[in-house]
């Protein structure tokens, strides 16, 4: 399961990389605003907004900030953001998916393309690497919420596809189509999840050496530092020693 553990760590590098909470809060607020604008401003009626609020709470984002982001969606003077997905290959031919919310498509595309190029990779067309990933729902709970067997039983009953339990928590995977229903059923049984979101999960991971791995982690960090970038996914596997060295 080393590859899976690293995939989780790579996904979570964003929180550690955003040294300034203000940058992280800005990204979280942007997702809340977009989610509220695309659906109802009530999280009880808007699953994406609820997921965004859960993510904000996990990062201790103040309640006032969350409410302000929702109100921004209701007002007519708020910024308009486009949801963009960029796909390409990083060092070593590793597949990378970048999700962004931007108010300037040309700027975002130019910046992200330059990051790929400088790292020795290249930005491709939409769909060029997505087939190597599953767009799936991930629902996470702390380990103490219930036993592995209880979570598994509840997940199966709710219609989940897979469950992985460890001493760090429970991860429930559900298809794109059933994710919201599964999350709702689990919340009714175990309470609010610590994470509930649609992700790009690599179908397989590609082992790379430390030199390539270091370049890839630097690319991911560079992408995450961009104001428009919300999430970065990649399908590589590196040594635990390098992950620890690079702060994973």
From Swiss-Prot:
Keywords from the named record: Cytoplasm, DNA-binding, Transcription, Transcription regulation
GO CC annotations on file: cytosol
GO BP term, pick one: regulation of DNA-templated transcription
Localization of this protein: Cytoplasm
Superkingdom, taxonomy of origin: Bacteria
MF-aspect GO terms: DNA binding
Region described as Disordered: spans on this chain: 1-21
Family affiliation: Belongs to the TACO1 family.
NCBIfam families, A to Z: PRK00110.1 (NF001030), PRK12378.1 (NF009044), YebC/PmpR family DNA-binding transcriptional regulator (TIGR01033)
Protein name stated in the entry: Probable transcriptional regulatory protein RPE_4771
């Amino acid at each position: 399961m080393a590859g899976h553990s690293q995939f989780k760590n790579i996904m979570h590098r964003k929180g550690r990389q955003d040294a300034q909470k203000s940058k992280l809060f800005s990204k979280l607020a942007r997702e809340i605003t977009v989610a509220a604008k695309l659906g109802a401003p009530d999280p009880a009626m808007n699953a994406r907004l609820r997921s965004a609020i859960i993510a904000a709470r996990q990062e201790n984002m103040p309640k006032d900030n969350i409410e302000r982001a929702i109100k921004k969606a209701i007002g007519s003077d708020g910024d308009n953001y486009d949801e963009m997905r960029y796909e390409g290959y990083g060092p070593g031919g590793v597949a990378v998916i970048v999700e962004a919310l931007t108010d300037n498509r040309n700027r975002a595309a130019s910046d992200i393309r330059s990051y790929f190029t400088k790292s020795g990779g290249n930005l491709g067309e939409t769909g060029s690497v997505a087939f190597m990933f599953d767009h799936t729902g991930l629902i996470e709970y702390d380990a103490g919420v219930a036993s592995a067997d209880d979570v598994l039983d509840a997940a199966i009953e709710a219609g989940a596809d897979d469950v992985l339990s460890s001493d760090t928590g429970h991860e429930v995977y559900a298809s794109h189509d059933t994710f919201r229903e599964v999350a709702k059923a689990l919340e009714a049984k175990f309470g609010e999840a610590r994470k509930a979101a649609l992700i790009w999960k690599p179908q397989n991971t590609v082992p790379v050496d430390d030199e390539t791995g270091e370049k890839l982690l630097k690319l991911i960090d560079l992408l995450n530092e961009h104001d428009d970038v919300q999430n970065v996914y990649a399908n590589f596997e590196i040594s635990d020693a390098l992950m620890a060295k690079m702060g994973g």
